[in-house]
């Protein structure tokens, strides 16, 4: 389930299927599906894999090439294999790209500038 303003870069994989680790259960063809939930304003970097049963919280960023095996909380940057939280997104992050300031200030008027 994807919510609003989710950015998914190229070559990402979302897999909801799981199979048993036990070989006898696998021989019987047993398989289950678990949902994936991606919150609002999430950015998923290129080549990331999101596994079954995972929830990614609102406003989080998943770094390129990550394999998300467990749920990620809201408002964080998470990266790696397996994906782990590196840090919270801070107020400083809002000023990291000053060339967006003119656009963000006028966005509510519908006359944004880049």
Task: Give the location of each predicted region.
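Flexible, glycine/small-residue-enriched loop-and-beta-strand segment within the central core
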Residues: 1-54, 88-90, 94
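Outer-envelope exported proteins of Gram-negative bacteria
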Residues: 5-11, 59, 63-65, 75
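Short-chain dehydrogenase/reductase
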Residues: 43, 61, 77-79
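Conserved acidic donor-binding loop of glycosyltransferase catalytic domains
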Residues: 15-16, 63, 69-70, 86-88
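Glycine-centered loop/turn positions within well-structured domains
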Residues: 74-76, 84
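Beta-rich strand-turn-strand
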Residues: 46-70
């Amino acid at each position: 389930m994807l919510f609003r303003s989710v950015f998914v870069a190229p070559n990402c994989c979302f897999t909801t299927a799981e199979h048993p680790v036990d070989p006898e259960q696998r021989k019987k063809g047993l398989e289950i599906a678990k949902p994936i939930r991606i919150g609002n304003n999430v950015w998923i970097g290129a080549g990331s894999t999101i596994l079954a049963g995972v929830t990614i919280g609102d406003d989080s960023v998943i770094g390129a090439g990550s394999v998300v095996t467990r749920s990620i909380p809201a408002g964080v940057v998470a990266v790696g294999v397996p994906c782990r939280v590196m840090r919270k997104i801070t107020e400083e992050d809002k000023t990291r790209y000053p060339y967006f300031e003119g656009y963000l200030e006028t966005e509510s008027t519908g006359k944004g500038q880049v």
